[in-house]
Amino acid sequence: MSEMKLYTAAGRFVHKRDSEGQTYPVIILGNREYLVDPQEFMIWINSNWRICRWEEIGKFYAASAAEAGYHNDRSWHDCTNRLLVRGLLVCGSGETKYDALYDLLSSMYLIPARGRIVLRLYVVIKLALQGRASLGGAKRLFSTFSHTKSEKQILKLAKQAMISTAEVICCMEKGIKNIRNEYGLMDAVYTDSETTSDNICQTVKGYRCCQDALEAIANLYVSQQLIFDRA
């Protein structure tokens, strides 16, 4: 049975200005800044808020490069491998899709993507003023933010502390909804001498809530409500 692999981007990007006032993208991951060239940035941005297979990375890149009229002699394979080495793209593998998804997400830290609701509100108001959106249409635009119970708990925890997917699963298994801060997280999750940050990913994989939590995190991510980071 062949091993399945899934990929996604990690970090967030900001615009910087050089001495001549020209803007360029910088990816921030684990409080470090990474410079990327246009080809690398194109692959990274197309993998962001997506969970995809290897061949899909190439498909998304080819479409974006053709639309932008961009050409580079370096293959997208080489470029993608460089991003993987730098940790800006991450890969999860396993015998099943669930195993690969768990391997991909379990050690990632969850950062709420702020500003998405404000942006959605702006779009709705603008369309309504232009007469291009009815009340029903506005309601449908906001319907994507109707969270499940698990999604609400995950977002609440992610807003309180720098928390990993595995730590979220542990909190959900214990019914913990409030941790206040990083100290509260330590008290909630690492309550015995056996559980450590090195083995928690293996420890919580067998928890009853694991699959539900993993699916909720993946849904929040692809709907652009979470950003993945590393410590």
Description of each model-found segment:
Residues 2-6:
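Phox homology (PX) phosphoinositide-binding domain
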Residues 9-42, 47-49:
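N-terminal ordered "arm"
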Residues 32-231:
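Long, charge-rich, low-complexity alpha-helical segments
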